[in-house]
Amino acid sequence: MKTKKWGIYRIFVCIVLSVFVVLFATMGIAGEDACFYCGMKKAMFGHSWMDIERMDGSAVGVCSVHCAAIDMALHIDQPPKNIHVGDFNSKKQIDAEKAYWIIGGDKMGVMTSRAKWAFENKASADNFMKEHGGRPAIFEEVMKAAFEDMYEDTLMIQKKRNMMRMKKAQP
């Protein structure tokens, strides 16, 4: 009887420890604020970071319009309720639908060769266009452009990551 109680106690302790390990691991991952799809850190990409809240209450943070397009395609039955994006200059999260968007220009985009930048006000967007080029757009056009660019951008990302792996492998 004593052995049976000891066995139950050991199982209980293992379960409790497993729960704590999972909880702490989850908190560590969530605390990093990394893109759900590519792992890029929010601290480095606040100027393009997007927070997507879906109708079902779930939410995700992604580094760019590119990764937001991936999320929208994968969650076709869970439409977004709110989408916020980082203002290019301040990194402050703003409503993506109300943002002043610029597509293109000479500044390399995040996860894309055709940049898509959001600005909180028109003056900032106009100043950016004067300095870097591009054209004004609304959010719907930005998302359409992201889907149009997806194939080429994915090939570009795969090529860059392969080159980085090769560099790391060299002595």
Region locations from a protein language model:
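Intrinsically disordered, low-complexity terminal tails/loops enriched in metal-binding residues
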Residues: F24-P171
